[in-house]
Amino acid sequence: EIASCLVGSEMCIRDRDCVVIGFDGEQLKVLLINRIGEENGKVYRDMKLPGSLIYMDEDLDEAAQRVLFELTGIRNVNLMQFKAFGSKNRTSNPKDVHWLERAMQSKVERIVTIAYLSMVKIDRALDKNLDEFQACWVALKDIKTLAFDHNLIIKEALTYIRQFVEFNPSMLFDLLPRKFTASQLRILFELVYDKAVDVRNFHKKIALMDYVVPLEEKQTGVAHRAARYYKFDRKIYNKTRR
């Protein structure tokens, strides 16, 4: 049974959408899935955030984990609620309404979604057997118009990240590999804050981060000067936050 409610004669659907962000060393990427629909007798394909409806017998967090696994194959990730989206204009696009009503087999006037955010290492395996959804990573700069208000949800997720890392920067290290270079970390900061970072000043900033630990290991097989690797030490980080 799907969670829904009647407001007057209108049906309101409760939904979960997940913004999953990864970093490939050069670009921020968002996990999207395929949407197949029919409009004016023609089949179309576009993209949307992984999301679906909540069942009556599950709580919000359970629904988010289930939805993400069923649509992408990713499980056991840290998902956090960051905002609810319930504008009446969410169902202003006839294409979206028609797709939703076919899926629900019922007339829908309103849809409210609780958005979840997760930042993961981009090498997480996606389930390629889920042919219908074809989950894939798309560079943030390459994302086109998505279903419903999903472009807005992604924009709000980035705003939330910028605010959150001001007092909890450990969130960013969830995107990095176990060992990373100062350049990778700097590029990540630039992408998150959408502004250039001075290289020299950034190295000074790293030196002040006790939890960013330099390793003896350096890059190999590179044409340029080999860069030193660093690692994020969560134990040291937790001590500095007390």
Regions flagged by a language model, labelled:
Residues 112, 216-242:
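Long, intrinsically disordered, low-complexity Ser/Thr/Pro-rich regulatory/activation regions
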Residues 16-20, 116:
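Short beta-strand scaffold segments in enzyme catalytic cores
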Residues 187-196:
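Short helix-coil junctions and helix-kink-helix linkers
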Residues 62-65, 69-124, 164-170, 210-213:
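Active-site segment of metal-dependent pyrophosphate-handling enzymes
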